[in-house]
Amino acid sequence: MAEKTQKSVKIAPGAVVCVESEIRGDVTIGPRTVIHPKARIIAEAGPIVIGEGNLIEEQALIINAYPDNITPDTEDPEPKPMIIGTNNVFEVGCYSQAMKMGDNNVIESKAYVGRNVILTSGCIIGACCNLNTFEVIPENTVIYGADCLRRVQTERPQPQTLQLDLLMKILPNYHHLKKTMKGSSTPVKN
């Protein structure tokens, strides 16, 4: 069983994925994406496509799970892909079920983003914020504080290119990495 699930993980050249991370199901990881040890990416209700230049930190959980009212044994639900854009940051211990996410978003530590939330681009979900509504979060929205207050920032968060470069250099020195795909077939950017 473990053999079969590992076969469907596609890692583009240039991505850094630590062996200690847990990746299950049909997952495609784009170039220049860094996945820390102990990060978990689980595709059980459909594939997960992760774009270019994303940073997924320790104990972050990205899961494409079945909705609570559907059990895969009794019904045969249509698999729905989870699409994650470019230059997103998933900080330590965050939980994301968002089925569609644009570019340059930050989900901070211990934040929770539910399945029915669509993040556009440039959004920041603050530490410990719980977002489980049926809505599309407008561009450049910041959600913060215990009451999940909202405001709009004037520009998008900067991509973490320097941090990604450093991690791509440092992580291979201290952790074993999962093998990338051969050839030049990289995932398509949405």
Swiss-Prot record:
GO function term, MF aspect, one: dynein complex binding
What processes does the entry annotate via GO biological process terms? Answer: mitotic spindle organization
What SUPFAM superfamilies does the annotation carry? Trimeric LpxA-like enzymes (SSF51161)
Under the heading CDD domains, the entry gives: LbH_Dynactin_6 (cd04646)
What Gene3D superfamilies does the annotation carry? Hexapeptide repeat proteins
According to its record, what are the GO cellular component terms?
cytoplasm; dynactin complex; kinetochore
Q: Which family does it belong to?
A: Belongs to the dynactin subunits 5/6 family. Dynactin subunit 6 subfamily.
What protein name does the entry list? Dynactin subunit 6
- What is the species of this protein? Pongo abelii
